[in-house]
């Protein structure tokens, strides 16, 4: 669904810190920190993951999954145009 690296990249594109992402998503700061520290796909309960993805989408972030159109063919993020 989303990786820790995608979370960090999305925050960088938005110019926000972990605390601000926690506020936007309705999740706790420790939850955001734990999710971002994941080496691969973030593990968590479905509700938390959905809150995170919805908050990023509302801010204009598009998640790029493996195998979709990107320069590298790997996961990433971009701002919707």
Residue ranges and their predicted role:
Residues 27-44:
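Recognition helix of helix-turn-helix/homeodomain-like DNA-binding domains
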Residues 6, 31-34, 76:
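Residue-level recognition of specific faces of alpha-helices
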Residues 61-81:
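Helix-turn-helix/homeodomain-like alpha-helical modules used for DNA recognition
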């Amino acid at each position: 669904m989303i990786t820790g690296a995608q979370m960090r990249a999305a925050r960088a594109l938005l110019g926000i810190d972990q605390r601000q992402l926690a506020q936007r998503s309705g999740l706790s700061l420790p939850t955001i920190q734990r999710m971002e520290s994941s080496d691969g796909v973030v593990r968590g309960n479905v509700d938390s993951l959905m809150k995170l993805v919805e908050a990023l989408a509302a801010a204009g972030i598009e998640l790029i999954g493996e195998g979709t159109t990107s320069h590298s063919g790997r996961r990433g993020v971009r701002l919707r145009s």
